[in-house]
């Protein structure tokens, strides 16, 4: 008896070509509302994590695995840092503003962290640093704290916040691409949720 192989119709991913579940960035007033509330409650770790998440624009997997040596030289917090991204295996550079440096310095001093220590260590015994899941829960608490619906926000909210503000001010897609560490400009266009025609028009006007 001849057996024929069972041919299956190739499945197309349900979300192919669609922008599904994009998490909105925080508005400037929301950034300050969260920051001030955390400062009033003397939540040193949260202030440092919040500020660095905004400045660095890193994916959660890269943010939670940062070590002190990645952002500091001895006792001095660097104004700029560079890491190798886990997803793309490519380097990305980010700025650390003065208020973020101050909050990080305060946190490191409070915890007496060494250069080889993880910047945000976990309280759990099975992990040396906070997990991406823990970080996501923290982000949800931040937005809930100022009355926002936490189901609409996530860790990508933190990654998108500063680049969205920069984009609205400059319309410079190439700069945003570099800041996010994207290899393709198309990825940046989709990440920001920009209309393709508008994006291409602006990209044509951007000298790189």
Language model segments and positions:
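Conserved catalytic core of the tyrosine transesterase superfamily
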Residues: 1-208
């Amino acid at each position: 008896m001849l057996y024929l192989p069972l041919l299956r119709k190739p499945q197309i991913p349900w979300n192919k070509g669609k922008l599904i579940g994009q998490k909105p960035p925080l508005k400037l007033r929301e950034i300050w509302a969260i920051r001030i509330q955390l400062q009033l409650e003397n939540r040193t770790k949260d202030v440092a994590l919040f500020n660095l998440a905004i400045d660095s624009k890193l994916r959660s997997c890269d943010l939670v695995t940062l070590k002190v040596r990645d952002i500091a030289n001895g006792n001095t917090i660097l104004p700029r840092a560079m890491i190798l991204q886990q997803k793309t295996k490519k380097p990305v550079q980010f700025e650390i503003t003065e208020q973020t440096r101050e909050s990080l310095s305060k946190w490191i001093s409070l915890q007496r962290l060494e250069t080889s220590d993880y910047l945000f260590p976990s309280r759990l015994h099975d992990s040396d640093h906070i997990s991406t899941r823990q970080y996501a829960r923290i982000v949800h608490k931040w937005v809930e704290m100022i009355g926002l619906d936490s189901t609409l926000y996530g860790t990508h909210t933190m990654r998108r916040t500063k680049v969205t503000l920069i984009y609205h001010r400059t319309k410079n897609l190439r700069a945003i691409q570099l800041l996010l560490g994207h290899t393709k400009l198309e990825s940046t266009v989709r990440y920001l949720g920009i209309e393709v025609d508008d994006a291409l028009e602006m990209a044509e006007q951007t000298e790189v």
